[in-house]
A protein has these predicted regions:
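Subset of Sec-pathway N-terminal targeting signals
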Residues: 1-44
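Active-site-adjacent bridging/hinge elements
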Residues: 2, 214-225, 246-247, 300-318
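Hydrophobic alpha-helical scaffolding
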Residues: 9-12, 27, 85-89, 150-154, ...
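Conserved active-site and cofactor/substrate-binding residues in soluble primary-metabolism enzymes
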Residues: 17, 94, 239-243, 331, ...
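Generic, well-ordered alpha-helical scaffold segments in large soluble proteins
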Residues: 21, 25, 29, 40-43, ...
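Extended, charge-enriched "interface" segments that sit outside catalytic cores
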Residues: 44-241, 257, 294
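Active-site pocket-lining segments that scaffold enzyme catalytic pockets across diverse folds
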Residues: 222-282
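Cofactor-binding active-site loop characterized by glycine-rich and histidine/acidic residues
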Residues: 261-407
Length: 407
């Protein structure tokens, strides 16, 4: 084998232009090249095609290439005159398509995500019509909106921009255009654009959301009033998380999830224990008062490190929830949760992750600042550690961390 490689070493890739030039000379005049090369090309001409057919002898390539080059330079026989007005309309339509793409890509950066208005939203030139050469005079011009899902094939520029801003720059910031799969991107567009990113709830759903928000806020107020000054890492500023995690549990059960492992740090943990996993409030209050002694925790540990597990009843049936224990290293629980999920999947013979899933709850500052988060993300889709996907929820209550400002 090595001998064969040595004998054909002159055919390696870097010699391709030289061999091609020799082959062209051979086709024009076989006697003009060296005898060994002539024999090599003779054998090449006699080699049958992959389907067994014997091809007709090759002909010189240069005249054919030159003929096509000359033809490409000749003017086309058919011309289609276009007026300046048509060209301007086409240019503006292209500009409109660029605006649609810009809002899908960049709209989240201009979304209204700061209810405290601590800083102004950044100016993004790409979201302004003037960036694409459009002016106020074009605002009432009708353009094609066929590649959107706003419910109309044509819209005035004014209405189109209003719809884009409501969808992508409202109280929701949606980043999805980085996804490489066009089917998934289209799915997001079809979910967001018809309702302008404004969910529609019936009265029963609104009452349920109000009840859950009241439960979350009520617990925080009670703890603040009853146990003044005790560390509890309040959920205040992120109360809607309780509604969110409820929806995750309900939707998971509908999709056939039987177990859900949750990992989170301190912020809002006590609220999740009571309002999501169903821990008895009396047990929590006893921990605040130092009366409750857990046989599972060593002496000196704190209540907001506690884990818990329970079976929760959903509309689709029961689901087992497990909140992992977590030490004061905020995000160190992340790989523990992934490992627990994978072990439970292996135990249930669930290689695709259809019956067990993980949910990780992060603080906004910890998610960005702690390396273990990204290290855990790097385990995704690996053969030994993949779980089929994890739900990540980042709570941003605009605190970050509760130390005083040294300035």
């Amino acid at each position: 084998m090595i001998k064969e490689l040595i004998q054909t070493s002159y055919l390696f890739g870097s010699n391709a232009p030289y061999v091609e030039d020799l082959y062209e000379q051979y086709l024009e005049d076989p006697a003009s090249i060296d005898e060994k090369w002539r024999q090599f090309f003779d054998r090449l001409q006699q080699t049958p095609a992959s389907d067994g057919r014997v091809e007709t002898p090759d002909v010189p390539h240069a005249p054919i290439i030159e003929a096509f080059a000359q033809r490409a330079m000749q003017p086309r026989g058919v011309s289609c005159p276009v007026s300046e007005g048509d060209l301007e309309i086409a240019r503006k339509q292209v500009a409109v398509q660029s605006i649609i793409g810009a809002y899908r890509f960049l709209g989240a950066r201009w979304a209204n995500l700061d209810p405290l208005h601590r800083r102004e939203r950044p100016k993004i030139p790409e979201l302004e019509p003037s960036f694409y050469g459009l002016s106020d005079a074009d605002m009432d011009t009708v353009f094609s909106a066929a590649n959107t899902y706003f419910g109309a094939d044509k819209m005035t520029l004014r209405d189109l921009i209003a719809a884009l801003r409501q969808t992508y720059c409202g109280d929701l910031g949606i980043e999805f255009m980085y996804i490489s799969d066009p089917v998934i991107k289209r799915w997001w567009q079809q979910k967001l654009e018809p309702n302008r990113s404004v969910p529609s709830y019936d009265n029963a759903a609104k009452k349920r959301i109000l009840q859950r928000l009241t439960a979350a806020e009520g617990l925080e107020r009670y703890l603040h009033t009853k146990y003044v000054g005790q560390k509890r890492f309040s959920l205040e500023g992120g109360e809607s998380f309780i509604v969110s995690i409820d929806e995750v549990v309900e939707a998971g059960a509908e999709q056939g999830i039987e177990e859900m492992v949750i990992g989170m740090a301190h912020r809002g943990r006590l609220n999740v224990l009571v309002n999501t996993l169903g821990k008895s409030p009396s047990e929590l209050f006893a921990e605040f008062e130092g009366k409750y002694k857990s046989k599972d925790l060593p002496a000196g540990d704190v209540k907001y490190h506690n884990g818990f597990s329970s079976d929760v009843v959903t509309a689709a049936g029961p689901i087992h929830l497990a909140l992992a224990f977590n030490p004061s290293h905020l995000e160190i629980v992340d790989p523990v949760v992934v490992g627990s999920v994978r072990a439970r999947q292996d135990r249930r013979d669930d290689p695709k992750g259809r019956r067990v899933m993980g949910v990780m709850v992060h603080g906004d500052a910890a998610f960005a600042g702690q390396g273990v988060v990204m290290e855990t993300l790097n385990l995704a889709d690996t053969r030994g550690y993949g779980t089929g996907g994890t739900m990540h929820i980042v709570i941003n209550n605009q605190i970050g961390f509760t130390t005083s400002d040294p300035r």
